Amino acid sequence: MILTRSDIGRARTWIAALLSSLAICAPAATAQAPSLFVDSRSTTAEAADRLDGRAKDDALFLARFPSASWLAYGSPDIVEAKARDIVSRALAARQVPVLVAYNISYRDCALYSAGGAADSGAYHDWIGGLARGIGDRPAIVILEPDGLGVIPWHRTLTGEFEGCRPEGQGEAAAARRYEELRGAVAILSALPNVHIYLDGTGSGWLAPGEIAARLIRADVAKASGFFLNVSNFESDDRIIPYARWVSDCIALVTRGGLDPRECPSQFSPASFENTASWTATDAAYDRLFARLRLTRAPERQKHAVIDTSRNGQGSWYPPAGKYRDAEVWCNPPGRGLGRLPSLESGNRYVDAFLWIKVPGESDGACLRGTAGPVDPERSVEAPPAGQWFAAQARELIELANPPLASE
């Protein structure tokens, strides 16, 4: 990739903000680009302690790279203590931690990662504990994976109900989800050295207009931007253009009054299957900026952070009709690590490439529409969500793209 002056300036602005945060919070030291926190007490390192042989070696190898710390349960006091411990150790190392807040009520629509706060009040208190734990120390906060992609009793822009429709709840559940996210953004954005990102789903999921409307309603204006591809597998050539389109769509809607349903997408005028056709969507955005007499300004628009922990081989496409529900996001076979985590993306729309999903940790049982308990694609009973899956860790390392220099 050839970097323009604007690209370089954009990266310098992002890094300067993090450097400033570190300088304010830490003793004086020589200025250098900040790095992401490599936690010696990560869940990957903990998994290595319980393993032996090749599985242990794989976990120790993966533990050398920075990955996110997931905060997904516990009382406000517990999450406060956990967050304080992580950000304090990161600050001492002059590194930037990535914290995943994953405790919103009715999380994951009661699927493999079910759980979360009991209600909106409990969630507000939990976020308050997280904020107290972070304090004035630098951190990147990934606020609620699937928080905007899977909303109970939510209607799309075309008025259709989505699939998450739990019994005993109604359309008020969707309004509560937005209230909870806006409340969390308000609390966390008051912290001086935190970069907050909201759920932006991915190019294999929602059209840019659909997710842009949700991000705007969730107060992305007060956040740094949105995260993409978390716990997913979309390749760089798909997810990076999508980041640009979501950012542009937000700008067109908020600055130009565009109806988000008019935002071009990976489905139109482009063809989803053919990424070569995606230049048609780029051109459509150019025309919209011209029509509304707006100047595209990536440096002032909302930016993405992208999860590259498992996207080296792209998404999995099983034969059509093989499974009643293929669950292509759930421990798919033959995937690989993607590009290494970095705060220097070289892209005007992307703040960082991160390993948000911890590579090597299971997505869940992955029954693919069967009665289980065996994953029919792998012919094994997969570990519960978040537990170490040694066979998958081995695949990710072997099939890494770009290839890893050494193991």
PLM regions: where:
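Surface-exposed substrate-engagement region within the catalytic domains
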Residues: E46-D58, L206-G372
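N-terminal secretory signal peptides that target proteins for export/translocation
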Residues: M1-R10
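Structural recognition of the beta-strand scaffold that forms the well-ordered cores
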Residues: S35-V38, S69-A72, V96-A101, P138-E144, ...
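Substrate-binding cleft of extracellular glycoside hydrolase catalytic domains
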Residues: S88-I196, E210-K222
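Boundary at the C-terminal end of the N-terminal hydrophobic targeting segment
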Residues: C25-A33
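A solvent-exposed, charged loop/short amphipathic helix patch at secondary-structure junctions
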Residues: T156-A172, L367-A390
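Bacterial N-terminal signal peptides
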Residues: W14-C25
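N-terminal carbohydrate-binding/catalytic regions of secreted carbohydrate-active enzymes
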Residues: A33-G133, K357-P384, A400-N401
